[in-house]
């Protein structure tokens, strides 16, 4: 699995020992003993099926394991996304800082969401400094142009839509939020989705 670092095996070994689980317990007759041993020594990476099995045996989510593997921190991308979603949208210095970090990230990676963040920080900086919402909306349009073509929205897209909803004209914001709330219904049992839904409704009420 290419998305996991070379330290997966060492992390797996450390967690297993901390939990006082045996290799036999982890493998549970689903993974050959020799295969499991090679994974802990970072000689091979797990298949997707084995990876999911190991997460289940560790009683962990993928997010928690990745957090541990990254020295108990979020990835660079997740840090950018979290910083953007949590900031005060009139904090120009912080907006500029996030924008610069996003541009540096894009020097190394091709990433649609981080590109969206650059556009949105541009829009928010303009709005905070000049109050010109028409000019700010020009920077939002490329983001919406990409998102509206998608066959479905997932949590990260829904978070982006929520972040920029107040920049749309009211009639468009009503339509977009309605579509977004319908998409969120698919996540009815997901704890984070409820927060997005509440925030979407709150932001829409502020526009009305």
Task: Show the residue positions of the predicted features.
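Residues that mark the N-terminal boundary/hinge immediately upstream of a DNA-recognition element
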Residues: 11, 22, 47-50
